[in-house]
Amino acid sequence: MPLHNKKDHMDCVYYATDESALFRQYRLSDSTDISDINESHSVLLYLAEGCLQITLGNFTSRTIEHGMLVFLPKNIGFTGQTIGSSYFIASFFAGRLPLCNKYDLVDLQYQVRQRNGRHLPPPSRQFPQLAVCEELVAFYSDLSHNLDEGLNCLHFHRLKQEELCILLRGYYSLEDL
C-alpha cells in the first residue's frame, strides 16, 4: 500500500533530513569509502547485502559479511570500504545506546562484571560483530520498505530506534551485546 498524503508528510517540519535522520540507507558500489560515517554520531550498522572491509581503533582489520551488526562509537578511529556492491542501514545515536528504558551499553557492562565476579573477559583482538537474528532481519526489512515509501518523519525514526533497542535487549544475551 502506498503512503497517503505524501506531499503533506514531506512538507512537515518534522520530516527527517540527511542531518537529522536517525536511520539512513546506503546502497553503494564497489570500493566506496565510508570512513566518515561515525564522525559526529555513534553508529549501529546493519549490513544487509555485500561486504565491508573495516578497521576500528586498535582492533585487527576484518571483513564484515552481510547479516551482521557492528557498533561504531563516535570519534574512534575508523576506516571502512565496500567490497562489491553493498547495502546497509545505519542507525545514528547522539549519546549512549539505550537498549531499553532500563539498560544501555554501560549498564550491560556492569551486569556482565557482576556475573563474572567484577571481571570482564579479556578483550578480543577483533572488534565485536553480532549476527542478526530473524526478528531483526524482519525489523530492518520493514524499516527499509517504510523509508523507501517516504515515511521519514523524526517521530517515526525515534519510535523505530526505540524498537530496535528493545529487540536487541530482548533477543540477545548481556554477553552478546
Where are these regions (language model features)?
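A short, N-terminal "cap"/entry segment at the start of jelly-roll beta-barrel domains
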Residues: M1-D18, E149
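Hydrophobic alpha-helices of bacterial signal-transduction systems
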Residues: K6-C12, F59-S61, P128
